[in-house]
UniProtKB/Swiss-Prot annotation:
Sequence positions that bind Zn(2+): 143, 147, 153
Domain of life of the organism encoding this protein: Eukaryota
Keyword vocabulary terms for this entry: Disulfide bond, Fibrinolytic toxin, Hemostasis impairing toxin, Hydrolase, Metal-binding, Metalloprotease, Pharmaceutical, Protease, Pyrrolidone carboxylic acid, Secreted, Toxin, Zinc
Regulation of its function: Is inhibited by EDTA, o-phenanthroline and tetraethylenepentamine.
Localization, UniProt: Secreted
Function, in words: Snake venom zinc metalloprotease that exhibits direct fibrinolytic activity.
Domain Peptidase M12B: 7-203
Subunit and interaction comment: Monomer.
Cofactor binding, note field: Binds 1 zinc ion.
Tissue expression notes: Expressed by the venom gland.
GO annotation terms (biological process): proteolysis
Single GO MF descriptor: metal ion binding
Name of the featured protein: Snake venom metalloproteinase fibrolase
Length: 203
């Protein structure tokens, strides 16, 4: 059991206009949903000694501030640009995740830049609000944050003591909240090689 150094991620979550519509413009409902997601993410990341703090929740209640499309790569690229040119100029944070009610093409429910944590454009992910079960959306965001933290998808040789681990390529119908040995190794390597500075400070 390796000991990981304590790290802190100041997180901004943006709910797009489709989310606003899906939840009938009820910002309290969206806020509750998002807080539950962040609580679960903290539970998942506790063994890695990473603490997430929600420093901002932005709801695009009038209109989207980027073009959100079913092509997940395009939406992620737009969101990354918007984070760099707009969000970062008015809100201090380490990472931003877009929560959208659009249906991404194919089986995709999320996308993020691998090893992007602390980079201007690439410390981002996009998450489809794909389930009425909060845990499943939280696991998707935890997975995409894993990519930002240097983790790749689990291969057959990766184990976590459950059927399926957080970084499995496909969300299992029996998902677990556990990271595989491979994910832990990837994260350790990311810390050592990239030494991301923005997650050192306690919020």
């Amino acid at each position: 059991q390796q000991r990981f150094p304590q790290r802190y991620v100041q997180l901004v979550i943006v709910a797009d206009h489709r989310m606003n519509t899906k939840y009938n413009g009820d910002s309290d409902k969206i806020r509750q949903w998002v807080h539950q997601i962040v609580n679960t993410i903290n539970e998942i990341y506790r063994p890695l000694n990473i603490q997430f703090t929600l420093v901002g929740l932005e709801i695009w209640s009038n209109q989207d501030l980027i073009t959100v499309t079913s092509v997940s790569h395009d939406t992620l690229a737009s969101f990354g640009n918007w984070r760099e040119t707009d969000l970062l100029r008015r809100q201090r944070h380490d990472n931003a995740q877009l929560l959208t009610a659009i249906d991404f093409d194919g089986d995709t429910v999320g996308l993020a830049y691998v090893g992007g944590m602390c980079q201007l454009k690439h410390s981002t992910g996009v998450i489809q609000d794909h389930s009425a079960i909060n845990l499943l959306v939280a696991l998707t965001m935890a997975h995409e944050l894993g990519h930002n933290l240097g983790m790749n998808h689990d291969g057959n040789q990766c184990h976590c003591g459950a059927n399926s681990c957080v970084m499995a390529a496909m969300l299992s119908d029996q998902p677990s909240k556990l990271f595989s040995d491979c994910s832990k190794k990837d994260y350790q390597t990311f810390l050592t090689v990239n030494n991301p500075q923005c997650i050192l400070n306690k919020p």
